[in-house]
C-alpha cells in the first residue's frame, strides 16, 4: 500500500535521507544531517510531500514529489525529487509502484509535465524509462584542477 507519509514516517525518512542521497548521487554527495534537514524542509515548505510504501507496517521506501518550475519558461511542472527503496526491500518491485503513484497524483493536480533528475549510472534509470521518462537535457561536468 502506498500512502502519504505520516509525521513519524517523515522523521524516519530524514534519518535515512543522507544515505539515500549518497547512493542516489553515485556516492558523490554525502550530506550532513543539517543539510538533509535544510533540503527536506525546503521541499516540504514549497508543497512537496512523501509517499511511502510499507511492508508489514515498516517503512520500505519512499518517493518525494511536488511542484517545481521550468528554469527557462517558469512554467509550473510536477517534479519527482527522490525515490528510495531501503536495501532490505530491494528486488521486490516497490520502486515502480511508488513512482506510478507519484505520477498519478501529480497528473491529477494538473501539471502538464513531470520531470526528475538522475545521476549517470544510477540503477533507477531503467525504472524511469519503463514508466515513459525520456532524456530531456544532459548535465555535464568537468573536474578542474586547482592551480597554486
Say what each PLM segment does.
Residues 96, 120-138, 142:
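Conserved active-site alpha-helix within GNAT-family acetyltransferase domains
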Residues 52, 58-67, 79, 84:
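Conserved beta-strand in the GNAT
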Residues 41-52, 79:
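A short helix-loop-beta-strand connector motif used in the catalytic cores of GNAT acetyltransferases and
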Residues 68-80, 90, 136:
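A conserved beta-turn-beta hairpin within the catalytic core of GNAT-like acetyltransferases
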Residues 18-39:
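Conserved GNAT-fold acetyl-CoA-binding loop/helix
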Residues 82-85, 91-104, 130:
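Conserved acetyl-CoA-binding loop-helix of GNAT-fold acetyltransferases
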Residues 1-15:
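A short beta-loop-alpha structural element at the N-terminal edge
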Residues 106-117:
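Conserved GNAT acetyl-CoA-binding A-motif
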Amino acid at each position: 500500500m502506498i500512502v502519504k507519509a505520516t509525521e513519524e514516517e517523515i522523521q524516519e525518512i530524514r534519518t535515512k535521507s543522507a544515505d539515500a542521497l549518497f547512493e542516489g548521487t553515485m556516492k558523490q554527495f554525502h550530506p550532513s544531517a543539517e543539510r538533509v534537514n535544510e533540503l527536506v524542509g525546503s521541499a516540504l515548505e514549497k508543497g512537496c510531500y512523501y509517499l511511502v510504501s510499507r511492508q508489514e507496517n515498516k517503512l520500505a521506501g519512499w518517493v518525494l514529489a511536488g511542484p517545481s518550475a521550468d528554469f527557462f519558461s517558469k512554467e509550473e511542472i510536477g517534479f519527482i525529487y527522490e525515490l528510495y527503496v531501503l536495501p532490505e526491500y530491494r528486488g521486490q518491485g516497490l520502486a515502480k509502484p511508488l513512482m506510478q503513484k507519484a505520477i498519478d497524483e501529480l497528473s491529477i493536480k494538473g501539471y502538464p509535465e513531470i520531470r526528475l533528475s538522475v545521476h549517470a549510472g544510477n540503477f533507477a534509470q531503467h525504472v524511469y524509462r519503463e514508466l515513459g521518462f525520456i532524456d530531456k537535457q544532459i548535465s555535464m561536468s568537468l573536474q578542474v584542477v586547482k592551480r597554486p
